[in-house]
Amino acid sequence: MKIFKKNEYDAKDIITFTFNKGTVLKGSEKRQAEVMKNGKNPGLGIRELHKKGITGKGINVAIIDQNLLLHHPEFDGKIAKYYDTGCEQDPNSGSMHAPAVTSILVGNKIGVAPDAKVYFAAAPSWKGDSEYYAKGLYWIIEENKKLPEGEKIRVVSVSAAPSGKGSPFTKNLKMWDEAVLAAQGDGILVLDCRNTETTGIIAPAFYNPEKPDNISMCKGGFPTSKYVVPSTQIGVPTSYRTVAEEYREGSPSYQYTGQGGLSWGIPYATGVLALGWQVNPALDKDQMVQILFKTCSTANDGSNIINPAAFIDAVKKTKK
C-alpha cells in the first residue's frame, strides 16, 4: 500500500494520476474513489447501447497480449480459450497489460462489448521476438477454422507493434507481417499499433472526464501531448480510464490511468466493432471498417473520433 499525505500531492491533479486500489491519497479519499468509479465508464454513449441490448452477445473476438489470470470479476468466464505462446511465467502471476486490455474489451463494468467471448493468446512482449505474436495469431487462425459459420472470430486486438517503423521488437518482425496477411486472407480483421493502412487505423484520443459521452469535446492524442487525429485514422478514448488489475491469482483489483497509451484504444475499437457484428453478422471486415470510418465525428479540435451510436445506426441500415 502507498500512502500519500496531503502535502505530497495537489488534489486538483488527481484526475491526471495513475493509481490503484492500494493507493491512499490522504484527505481526498472520496474524490479518489469518484475518479476511479468514473473511469470505468467507456463513454461516447456505449452504456446507452448496452441498455438497448447491444453488448457484443454471440460475437467471438481475440486478443494477443501478455500472460493473463482468467478469473478477474470483470471477465471471469469470458475467455473461450487461452493459449500461452511461451511466456514462461508463474501460472499464479499475471501482468499489468493483459487484464487492462481484456477489461476494456469485455469487462462487465468497464468493457465496450461485455457479452463478447475472447480467444486469448499470451505472448511475452518483453522478449522482443515477434515470433511469439505470429505464433499466437496462427493459433487464432486455426481455432477459427474449427468454428462453425456464424461463430467465427471476427477481429484480433493487438496492443503492440510487432513490426514496422519504430517497432520495439528486434527479432522475426517479418513473421508478424506474414501472420497478419494469413489472418486477413481468412477474413479476420487485425488491429495493432503499427502505422499501416489496414491494421494501424486507431489513434489515441481522450474524452472530457466530466462529460465522457460528449464526442465533440474529445481531443486527439494525450492530455499532455495533444494532436489532431487525421481522417485516415480513428481517435479512440485511451485516457482517464479505470482498468482491471491482477498480479497474483485471487487478488483482483483496479487501476486508474490518468493517461493511457494507444494500447487502451485498440481493445476499445475492437469492442465497438463487436457491437456492430452483433447487429449485422453478415458484414465482412472491410465493410465494417468502412462504416466505422464513415460514421466518425469531427471533434471541436478537428480530430476524427469514433462515434459508436452513429456506427450502430449505420450498421442497422445495412440490414434493410
Model-predicted segments: where are they?
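Subtilisin-like peptidase catalytic core
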Residues: 59, 66, 79, 85-168, ...
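N-terminal domain-start motif of subtilase-like serine proteases
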Residues: 31-61, 85-91, 216-219, 306-307
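Autoinhibitory propeptides
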Residues: 1-39
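Acidic-leg catalytic submotif of subtilisin-like serine proteases
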Residues: 2-7, 44-86, 188, 192
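Extracellular S/T/G-rich loop segment that most often corresponds to the catalytic His/Ser-adjacent loop
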Residues: 65, 184-188, 192-278, 282
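Extracellular/periplasmic catalytic domains that process cell-envelope and extracellular macromolecules
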Residues: 53-57, 111-114, 148-152, 183-185, ...
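Catalytic-core regions built around general acid/base machinery
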Residues: 171-191
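C-terminal subdomain of the subtilisin-like protease fold in secreted/lumenal serine endopeptidases
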Residues: 149-160, 278-320
